[in-house]
A protein has these predicted regions:
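Sequence-specific dsDNA recognition surfaces
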Residues: 16-28, 37-70, 204-219, 233-262, ...
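A short beta-sheet element
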Residues: 64-66, 70-121, 231-232, 248-311
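Extracellular/lumenal glycan-associated surfaces
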Residues: 161-167, 352-357
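Periplasmic-binding protein-like
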Residues: 123-126, 316-317
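Active-site/binding-pocket entry motifs
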Residues: 42-43, 81, 235-236, 272-273, ...
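Non-catalytic DNA-recognition/assembly elements of restriction-modification systems
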Residues: 1-26, 146, 150-158, 169, ...
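A short glycine-rich beta-alpha junction/loop motif
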Residues: 2-3, 8, 78, 92-99, ...
Length: 386
């Protein structure tokens, strides 16, 4: 609850006193609308809707019957710890698990102020605390309506909107620059590898390729040790420099595990969606599970050249398993994967050209982090005093 000492003109209200849930039901096929927004179309801490589905392009579940209009706020009521709040800038349909919200009176609560209120830590903490269920927690609007906060007068709301909107614009500019820099890096890498005219060799001839296993969870003596252990999902880190789970020396000795050295490239051999074929650079010594393939470079391979090469061959690696029964990669298949190997000097030239762009990516990521923290603090200041 945002209940700091209030300035003159501020008043304590409940969310449900000034906000309403819009329940405008439509039939998707006859609504004349073209787009729908599902939960996975909304991103954490991002007020913009950047993706959507096309109505009529495939099966749309029976829950998708709530209409939203430009300016209304969409709020993901499932797993609210994901902080999914977005402002619609087009007409569309969402599921009934996505709340469509608007102010009851725009002369009391500015529509532009509402989404910033819903991004505050206090609002999110209240929503998470009052959610029901454990596997897929959800909150009812009637519970959300009990959230209390100090409502600023309209002039204060306008000033807060001006500040927060400026920060949103900064974040959007940094995000756009970051996306452009990432695209440039990928393009430079593809161009560099396409110009390599060295003969291709089977990867197993120039690298040691192996996988690991998952020690039995029931054996307590195998877990909570000091040796990093990585599941396949860690591939999304791209540069893996920390582990979330650790195993013991006993697990390393008794299970079919090897400590994979830093500088190896890990490839996700099995995975739903876009996971299979992804590559990550291992920046620490670690053990891996059975669905990771570790490519440990030999003397003729620069570790970063190998990583960038395999990262650029994402689609080729995904399709390398075609024709197999399980539609998955394996250590055997990875050993057969052909890669070009120029001399080490040329490899390092390619690496340096990519690393130069990566340095810019890191700078932008740091700017994004700092600006996002400024935005978070500004959210709190906008709704509290003292």
């Amino acid at each position: 609850m945002l209940d700091k000492v209030k300035k003159p003109g501020w008043r304590q209200v409940k969310f449900g006193d000034v906000v309403r849930q819009v329940k405008e039901r439509v039939e998707p096929e006859t609504s004349g609308l073209e787009r729908y927004v599902a939960g996975d179309h909304m991103d954490t801490d991002d007020l913009r809707i950047r993706r959507w589905g096309e109505i009529g392009s495939g099966y749309l579940g029976p829950a998708f019957h709530m209409r939203f209009r430009p300016g209304q706020v969409l709020y993901g009521s499932r797993r609210t710890y994901l902080r999914k709040v977005a402002v619609a800038d087009f007409d569309g349909i969402c599921a009934n698990t996505t709340f469509v919200i608007e102010p009851k009176n725009a002369e009391e609560l500015l529509p532009e102020f509402l989404p910033f209120l819903m991004q505050t830590d206090a609002f999110n903490e209240f929503s998470v605390k009052n959610s029901k269920g454990s596997v897929n927690p959800y909150i009812n609007f009637s519970d959300l309506a009990r959230f209390e906060f100090a409502l600023p007068p309209l002039g204060e709301q306008r000033r807060s909107v001006s500040l927060l909107s400026a920060l949103e614009d900064q974040i959007e500019a940094i995000r756009a620059a970051s996306n452009a820099t990432t695209k440039l890096r990928k393009s430079v890498a593809l161009d560099a590898f396409s110009l390599v005219d060295s003969p291709k060799v089977k990867m197993g001839a120039v690298a040691d390729i192996r996988n690991g296993t998952t020690p039995r969870r029931a054996r307590d003596e195998y877990w909570k040790g000091s040796i990093p252990w990585l599941p396949t999902g860690k591939v999304n880190d791209r540069i893996i420099d920390a582990a979330d789970e650790f195993i013991t020396e006993q697990a390393l000795e008794e299970c079919p595990l090897t400590l994979i050295p830093a500088g190896s490239t890990l490839i996700a051999m099995i995975g739903e969606g876009q996971t299979r074929g992804r590559a990550a650079m291992l920046a620490i010594d670690a053990c891996i599970n059975q669905n990771f393939g570790a490519v440990i470079p030999g003397k003729t391979l620069d570790p970063w050249y190998l990583f960038y090469l395999l990262e650029s061959n994402y689609e080729a690696l995904r399709h390398w398993s075609q024709g197999t029964n399980q539609h998955a990669l394996s250590c055997g298949l990875l050993k057969e994967f052909p890669i070009p190997i120029p001399d080490l000097n040329r490899q390092r030239e390619i690496v340096e050209s990519i690393k130069e762009i990566e340095a810019n990516e890191r700078q932008l990521a740091e700017r994004f982090k700092k600006t996002a923290e400024m935005r978070r603090v500004a959210h709190q200041v906008a709704l509290s005093v003292g």
